[in-house]
């Protein structure tokens, strides 16, 4: 489960930000997770709750925004929606599709007090 190490990385970023801003606690963390990122939102929620126990982020709400997958189809020469990383183009059926979006995971927002 790589979500545990990802949650630990998010916590490190959150703690660094909270420390830099002299915050007393973290109220909310917003993550953007691409549908093609191989990150399971429910697993990251579980892991985030586990790794934040005893930290400045304990009890913080975790909001996840799903980023749709997109890719460039070399046959169609256009951007197409993607639902799986190595899937076929929904327009022409070609497998020559290069992902262009939805593979990322990033911290979009941290609310502190």
Swiss-Prot record:
Ni(2+) binds at residue 2. Zn(2+) binds at residues 73, 76, 89, 92. Disulfide bonds: none annotated. One of its GO terms (biological process) is protein modification process. Keywords: Metal-binding, Nickel, Zinc. PANTHER family: HYDROGENASE MATURATION FACTOR HYPA. This is Hydrogenase maturation factor HypA. The lineage of its organism: Bacteria, Pseudomonadati, Pseudomonadota, Betaproteobacteria, Rhodocyclales. The gene is hypA.
